[in-house]
Amino acid sequence: MSISKEQVAAIAGLARLQLDEDKKELFAGQFAQILEYMDTLNEVDTDGVAPLYSPVQHATVYREDEVQRHCSREQVLANAPEEDGTFFIVPRIV
């Protein structure tokens, strides 16, 4: 399967990329290689093979939410460049 430079330009436009003609030619070749590889994968016989959603067999482990206090307010505020004793002071944005 091949892809034209015009198709590459359309894809680049969607991504808001500006490509010169050399890059369009380069990417057209690379896209063609990727699509050929996908065609090769599509030829693999997968009849009787269960769908695989994750290569790792694991179960989600749930735990109870427990409130834990890791740092005191003073310890947290000690890392702030500026604070008022209760809150971080940050520059005004708007």
UniProtKB/Swiss-Prot annotation:
UniProt-listed Pfam families: GatC
Disulfide bonds: none
Coiled-coil stretches: none
Record keywords, A-Z: ATP-binding, Ligase, Nucleotide-binding, Protein biosynthesis
EC primary class: ligase
GO molecular function annotation: asparaginyl-tRNA synthase (glutamine-hydrolyzing) activity; ATP binding; glutaminyl-tRNA synthase (glutamine-hydrolyzing) activity
Reported function: Allows the formation of correctly charged Asn-tRNA(Asn) or Gln-tRNA(Gln) through the transamidation of misacylated Asp-tRNA(Asn) or Glu-tRNA(Gln) in organisms which lack either or both of asparaginyl-tRNA or glutaminyl-tRNA synthetases. The reaction takes place in the presence of glutamine and ATP through an activated phospho-Asp-tRNA(Asn) or phospho-Glu-tRNA(Gln).
PANTHER family: GLUTAMYL-TRNA(GLN) AMIDOTRANSFERASE SUBUNIT C, MITOCHONDRIAL
Protein name: Aspartyl/glutamyl-tRNA(Asn/Gln) amidotransferase subunit C
Source species of the chain: Oleidesulfovibrio alaskensis (strain ATCC BAA-1058 / DSM 17464 / G20) (Desulfovibrio alaskensis)
